[in-house]
């Protein structure tokens, strides 16, 4: 999850889900006009709107999700406004709302990285605990993965939850590897 500049990377199409950045579970779609004009879309008979971007909608849009997605972006931009001075160098060529959003993402990334580093440093020497991820000093996300010898991930999550620490213990969309 990161900052994308569709113009800088000359993206034809970008799809995302706002739940990745504090919004609801729904889809968001960017498409260059010339690419969109060449795409066919499924249509319902009662809908004769053939112009982009409306022809990509297959029915009534869920306004609650659209509102939630917009508010998620507003949430990020608000954080960016409050922390813009921290990222003047990185955002020198940006202005307005784009700058606010980028500063918000950078502020959250910075905060999450600090928390993850604190966690990694705090647990790395626990006997029987194996920490997974890139070597120190290499780029990494704020995701911290570990196992504890002799315990399954569900039991670890329950023990931590009993102490007010909440972690994910699922298969992270890789259930087949757990079955093997």
Indicate residue ranges for each PLM-predicted region:
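Pyridoxal 5′-phosphate
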Residues: 1-180
